[in-house]
Amino acid sequence: MRKATIERKTGETQISLTFAVDGEGQSNLTTGVPFMTHMLDLFTKHGHFNLTIDAKGDTEVDDHHTTEDLGICLGLALKEALADKKGIRRYGSAFVPMDETLAQVVVDLSNRPHLEFRADMPSEKVGTFDTELVHEFLWKLALEARMNLHVIVHYGENTHHIIEAIFKALARALDEATTIDPRVKGVPSTKGML
């Protein structure tokens, strides 16, 4: 099973995260950031991953450090779980509608980190969660997973729907990109490595 555990402890957060690429959509999440718990739960379900998180952070300040470090840890776990990336499809894309919203996510597990984020958030907050943290989480995820990640929201009015559609599309795109393709011999690159 392609799986990794990451332990991260700083002056701001303490996180233990276990991620399995080949899962059943099961999650056991304690993040201290309820909205991120919700998003990571549906990410796990729609990507058919398994994810366990035990996180404590300085949420009395705000959710920034915990959300950022969750992205770091998930990115590191994805990179470690995929190891040399032999046999994977490498690319994945998904469109996900949620009511009035349509989100698109495209990924390339290229070892070349980049985030292209084209999503306007109508509201600065969903509940107590700062919506600008979605970009922060995704950038740290892309950076640490060494993934090229494009997020495009074609339209949408409800901020919760926009963010939820992004996370579901991310899950489906990563599920596709991490799938082992029996036609792929070795690493999916003409360079012979990623």
UniProtKB/Swiss-Prot annotation:
Pathway: Amino-acid biosynthesis; L-histidine biosynthesis; L-histidine from 5-phospho-alpha-D-ribose 1-diphosphate: step 6/9
Protein localization: Cytoplasm
Keyword field: Amino-acid biosynthesis, Cytoplasm, Histidine biosynthesis, Lyase
GO cellular component: cytoplasm
Catalytic activity: D-erythro-1-(imidazol-4-yl)glycerol 3-phosphate = 3-(imidazol-4-yl)-2-oxopropyl phosphate + H2O
GO molecular function: imidazoleglycerol-phosphate dehydratase activity
NCBIfam families: PRK00951.1-2, PRK00951.2-1, PRK00951.2-4, PRK00951.2-5
Protein name: Imidazoleglycerol-phosphate dehydratase
High-level lineage: Bacteria, Bacillati, Bacillota, Bacilli, Bacillales
Gene: hisB
